[in-house]
């Protein structure tokens, strides 16, 4: 049965839409967009007071399957994604076995098709086993559906190995996503190196440990002509390096997370809250402000979550022994609405670019547009819905949110993936 969505405020900068129109969905496609639509026999849904936008895509998510299903699996991770308003996620390859060959890529895709609540786009490892010693089977992975290459979780430590990966892999036209961490310099760093790490007697994670590899990777991208994407950028100087690389004509993009925009090392002070232990670490107030400005001015290309679920008992360990990472799929949209859109610092149109259009562009995916003939991957949100993070639990298997207890304004209410509703009135279908 066709579905007519009426009275939503539709925002899609790619087709210059920003106003109240109706959207008719028939099967997996948008059949018609216009004012005062009438469709005989269609189910009618009134979306007054809500926004409808192209489906959001999170291009940095850890679904943990295969191998770490005790933390998260594809079913629970995509359920969390749908709850947060996402129609698609890019899955990182640090699984067990590592996604470094076509067989694992096929498993992720088939499992997502079987149990997923949104689309799953697998990324493939640059190197075998994420060890940085030998190139992975890039061609085989692309043939089976990999959309990008990354050793996320570690990063490629050897400059020569990264160059070889880029020189060879660029023929496939995929982006290389770089986790920038100089392991020798960072050592066993736990939180940002500075006053807070000194007060808490925790080993510091220097900003230079990230910035050195950002600079290196930009130079290697320039040398090879490969497409480079800097993951979870967290420092002001790192952002300047990306800005300079873009100005020099290097094919470089970058992403930022809500936790690096809206939390700082000061939130850790005297708390030892392991949910705030992330990689790269929460930085200074100045760094967070620079990242926010980069998101607004266009230097940052995409907002991602780096959704990293862990079991409660892992995060309950001593700070030095607890794993890095926090969950974010269910809070990302709401945080951006609360902190940037509802405060007037950023438009809904810019948010759509950061969370829907640019992620698809960087990953080489087909764009979704609110126009007739486009695939009906759509996100609907209520900008005035107020809720408290964690109050009603999580769809994710994990609970390690750094924003637990925070009251947010704005939340996804409905999600459509290929015309099929996966979130209805805030409930998973």
Regions found by a protein language model. Give the residues of each.
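His/Asp/Glu-enriched, well-ordered alpha-helical/loop segment
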Residues: 199-227, 294-297, 301-303, 308-383
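Histidine/acidic residue-rich metal-binding segments in metalloenzymes
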Residues: 135-303
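N-terminal metal-binding scaffold of metallo-dependent hydrolase/deaminase domains
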Residues: 1-39
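Alpha-helix-loop-beta-strand connector modules within alpha/beta enzyme cores
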Residues: 102-119, 167-178, 335
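Divalent metal-coordination and catalytic microenvironments
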Residues: 8, 23, 28, 49, ...
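Metal-associated gating/positioning segment near the N- to mid-region
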Residues: 48-112
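Active-site metal-binding motif and surrounding structural segment of the metallo-beta-lactamase
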Residues: 36-53
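C-terminal cap of metal-dependent C-N hydrolases
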Residues: 318-321, 375-427
